[in-house]
């Protein structure tokens, strides 16, 4: 997902009075915005917030996730494409830790008899 994937028909707000009331206009704009967001997020499996050593914070959108031969295979999108390569090992580590934790919890449950 990147900014070029979205079709943004943004309304130019006119200062002149409209036939629709303020509340109706707000509701319509909210619904249009919600539709755009849902469309952009329909392929997102998980959102992760990562804070790098330099203090910068990045929202990562995981769009593909597989476990092949003991390794995580994934794809993700970020708003700052210039830092995607820098974020990749952090995203992979985060996903791997989550999967390992889930496998460990599942394995522990198999050995409980009550």
From Swiss-Prot:
* Signal peptide bounds: none
Instruction: Please name every pair of cysteines joined by a disulfide bond in this record.
Output: none
Composition-biased stretches, type Acidic residues, lie in 1-14
The record's listing under Pfam families reads: Phage_head_chap
Residues of the region (Disordered) are 1-26
Q: What does this protein do?
A: Helps head vertex assembly.
Task: Identify this protein by name.
Answer: Head formation protein
Species, as recorded = Enterobacteria phage T4 (Bacteriophage T4)
Species lineage, top-down? Answer: Viruses, Duplodnaviria, Heunggongvirae, Uroviricota, Caudoviricetes
UniProt lists the gene as 40
């Amino acid at each position: 997902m990147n900014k070029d994937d979205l079709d943004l028909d943004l309304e130019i707000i006119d200062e002149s009075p409209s036939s629709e009331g303020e509340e109706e206009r707000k509701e319509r704009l909210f619904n249009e915005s919600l539709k755009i967001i849902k469309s952009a997020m329909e392929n997102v499996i998980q959102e992760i917030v990562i804070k790098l050593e330099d203090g910068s914070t990045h929202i990562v959108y995981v769009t593909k996730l597989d476990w092949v031969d003991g390794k995580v295979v994934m794809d993700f999108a970020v708003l700052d494409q210039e830092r995607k390569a820098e974020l990749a090992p952090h995203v992979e580590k985060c996903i791997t830790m989550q999967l390992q934790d889930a496998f460990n919890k599942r394995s522990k449950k198999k050995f409980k008899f009550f």
